[in-house]
Regions:
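Surface-exposed beta-strand edges and their flanking turn/coil or helix-capping segments
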Residues: 113, 125, 179-181, 203-205, ...
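Short, charged interaction patches at domain edges and termini
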Residues: 1-34, 155-157, 169-184, 232-291
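Generic structural motif
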Residues: 77, 103-105, 113-117, 169-171, ...
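Residue-level recognition of well-ordered beta-strand positions that form the cores
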Residues: 111, 187-193, 278-284
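Acidic, Ser/Thr- and Gly-enriched intrinsically disordered low-complexity segments
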Residues: 151-167, 183-249, 289
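Short N-terminal edge-element motif at the start of the domain
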Residues: 129-159
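Broad, structure-driven detector of short, well-ordered beta-strand segments within folded domains
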Residues: 89-92, 164-168
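Extended beta-strand solenoid/passenger and fiber regions
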Residues: 2-130
């Protein structure tokens, strides 16, 4: 099945949002962290691959940052992050792990100097309430290493904070002019979870001021992350990717509404002491949906 407008919009927004957090005016990443990886049995990998888990989640894939991630050292030898040139070694930027062919073995020594996100980002297809009620959270602070332990129940419902959860809340079409052009009005909601109020204040302040910016629509099939959240075309730069679609569809940010959630009753009910903020992005896209 081909991706439709909503998938294109959500993935394009995610890439824009992720990149916005890495810009010099907010710089939500930590660089040059000593990182070691250890072998872990992962149930989500194909049977012909194995994984080594690093100490930090959500490595920065963007190449334009200071000290970009270029690869890892395996048994003392540098291995580039380009899977097409390194013998099918994949850097899983989302989970912070190295994925290798099964024949590589389980006794490798893998290290890196890593640049990691200070704010993790997730695309969510669940409601905010379900995420809060049904998920587990680890607030590791990206300057503090955290090792996956197989005795712990870390799965797809475990998220590492601070984090932003991005979801498409609503959308609708309004007739704009004769000829079939319509205005698609969409609302994307971002929920921010952390125990650090400084981080929440910084995020909502920065993104409140993005009102009236524009976002290039990047086709879903051009999403830069592929197998195990590795970069399809290495190195990856968001600005370079979006420049390929400057003549395509553009989405405008009409308004950004932000609010903090202060509810001791909610915190007691879910037994989680983090702070919550929401950001509602009201978006407008002029398009010909029936052509």
């Amino acid at each position: 099945m081909k991706a439709q407008f909503d998938q294109n919009l959500l993935s394009s927004f995610y890439l824009w949002f992720e990149n916005r957090l890495l810009k010099d005016d907010i710089k939500a990443y930590v660089q040059d962290l000593d990182n070691t990886f250890k072998y872990v049995e992962f149930s989500d990998l194909p049977s012909d691959f194995i994984g080594y888990q690093g100490q930090f989640r959500q490595l920065v894939a963007e190449n334009s940052v200071e000290s970009p991630n270029s690869g890892v050292f395996i048994n003392g030898d540098f291995v580039t992050g380009d899977s097409s040139a390194n013998g099918s070694v994949f850097i899983d930027n989302q989970e912070g792990r190295v994925v290798l062919p099964l024949a590589s073995g389980t006794n490798l020594e893998i290290t890196a100097n890593s640049t990691v996100k200070e704010i993790n980002t997730y695309i969510s297809n669940d409601s905010d309430l379900n995420i809060i009620l049904q998920s587990d959270f680890v607030e590791n602070g990206q300057t503090s290493p955290y090792f996956f332990n197989q005795s712990e129940k870390l799965d797809e419902k475990t998220f590492f904070l601070p984090a932003c959860f991005i979801s498409l809340a609503s959308s609708g079409n309004d007739e704009h002019c004769f000829g079939g052009m319509e205005e698609t009005k969409s609302r994307i909601q971002v929920m921010v979870l952390t125990r650090d109020n400084f981080i929440i204040d910084s995020i909502i302040s920065k993104f409140r001021d993005t009102a009236r910016e524009s976002i290039n629509n990047i086709p879903y099939e051009s999403f830069p992350y592929g197998f195990s959240y590795s970069v399809k075309s290495f190195p990856y730069e968001y600005d370079e990717l979006k420049s390929n679609f400057e003549d395509g569809m553009t989405t405008h940010i009409d308004k950004v509404g932000v609010s903090k959630v202060f509810s001791e009753k909610l915190r007691e009910a879910i037994n989680k002491d983090f702070s919550i903020a929401t950001m509602d992005f009201d978006l407008s896209t002029y398009r010909f949906p029936r052509l």
